[in-house]
Regions:
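Flexible loop residues that form catalytic
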Residues: 87, 132, 167
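Short, glycine-/small-residue-rich phosphate/pyrophosphate-handling segment
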Residues: 95-96, 108-162
Length: 213
């Protein structure tokens, strides 16, 4: 099984990256061939509306824009599992997450019947890390983020969403203008909860990457 893990956070060692590295190890634990990509390292744009993927003269299930993201999309569509993680900024995943989703999903979407040109099956794990507590996610973010899950359903397999709540933004809040947050409470919460989130990310990575016999 081929698993591609994509970090759509600009931070390579903080919450989202740690969650994804745990999912990566979970995938490896069941024998998957795993590739890890930091999305902020590559030159990319969102969908440029060139519509070449919708032309009657071109091959379907392919993004034709010439930048570093197109070959990654090609590898994703040849893989078996996609694990993507993003922090939540102003209630939404990052712009890089959005760019990936736009171009990956648009190039497989049929404008004849709104079905999917993609005939394979790609399991998807979506990991969102956020400063917000669980009640805010439930009341404000969850319904909106569910739309992303609906789009990834066009890849014809399982889609699992895992939110990580009340994360630490920095190690030492006293160095920043962040007095709205209770550092002691956040650190205590993360001390107890974040290891559980890492374990769950490992489990999801393994579950989605496990070869069905």
């Amino acid at each position: 099984m081929k698993t591609i893990v994509i970090n759509a956070s600009p931070r390579k060692r903080w919450n989202t990256a740690q969650i994804l590295k745990s999912a990566y190890e979970g995938a490896k634990s069941v024998g998957a061939d795993v590739e890890y990509i930091d999305l902020y390292d590559i030159d990319l744009k969102g969908c440029m509306s060139c519509l070449v993927c919708k032309s009657k003269k071109t091959e379907k299930v392919k993004c034709y824009w010439r930048d570093d993201l197109s070959p990654i999309i090609e590898r994703i569509l040849e893989a078996d599992i996609l694990l993507v993680g993003s922090p939540i900024y102003f209630g939404k995943p990052t712009s890089h997450f959005r760019a990936l989703m736009e171009r990956l999903i648009f190039c497989i979407l049929s404008y004849d019947d709104y079905g999917s040109y993609y005939k394979g099956k790609l399991n998807v794990g979506l990991f969102y890390t956020m400063n917000a507590p669980e009640d805010v996610y439930n009341e404000v973010y969850e319904e909106d983020l569910k739309e992303n899950e609906n789009l990834f359903n066009l890849l014809n397999a399982n889609v699992i969403t895992y939110p990580v709540f009340n994360t630490l933004q920095v190690k030492d809040y006293s160095k920043y203008h962040m007095s709205a947050f209770n550092e002691e409470d956040k650190k205590e919460f993360n001390k107890n909860q974040f290891p559980k989130d890492l374990e769950e990310a490992f489990r999801i990575g393994a579950k989605l990457s496990k070869k069905i016999k």
